[in-house]
Amino acid sequence: MKGEQRMSLDGIRIGFCMTGSFCTFEKAFAVTERLVQQGAKLVPIMSFNAASISTRFGTAEENIKRLETIAGCKVIRTIEEAEPIGPKKMCDIMVVAPCTSNTAAKLALGLTDTPATMAVKSHLRNARPVVIAISTNDALAGCAKNIGYLQNLRNYYFVPYAQDNCEKKPNSIVAEFELIPETIQSALDGIQLQPVIRVK
């Protein structure tokens, strides 16, 4: 019932889409493990960059394998594979974590040129919720208008976020990844988890 917090994610089909904020991949993987432990069924998705770029945070192959191991199925890595998500009603909710400024900009403009943005677009055709876990160094600069735009759209919900290093990176914002399960629970009931802006 709307307004009542769900105690479990058992049986909930969660599209979990990772984009290229590689420094937060470890947090994202930890969340996917929690979601599976809570009974959720994951539909894993990666943007082109997330699935192809190797960094000090892991090789592309390692990251793909890790997500597939947690989810128990193959990662969706192409636009063609992502397109049926909506028509087949594959997900009850879509999570983009981490969501880069590039992905946020494309979502705000309705661009669907990556598996991530196609997954969200296809999912939204069913008027089902999308949860954004923003992670970008320009959240309070160039990306601010896109974050604000998405927050004002129906069916979009944001994981609460905070400045991660206000002295050295004053424009940087990172979502509180540990709040993703709670944000999902609220979004499934049509409620934005509050407060959205957190202070560390």
Where are these regions (language model features)?
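A cross-family phosphate/adenosyl-ligand binding-site feature
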Residues: K2-V130, S135-K200
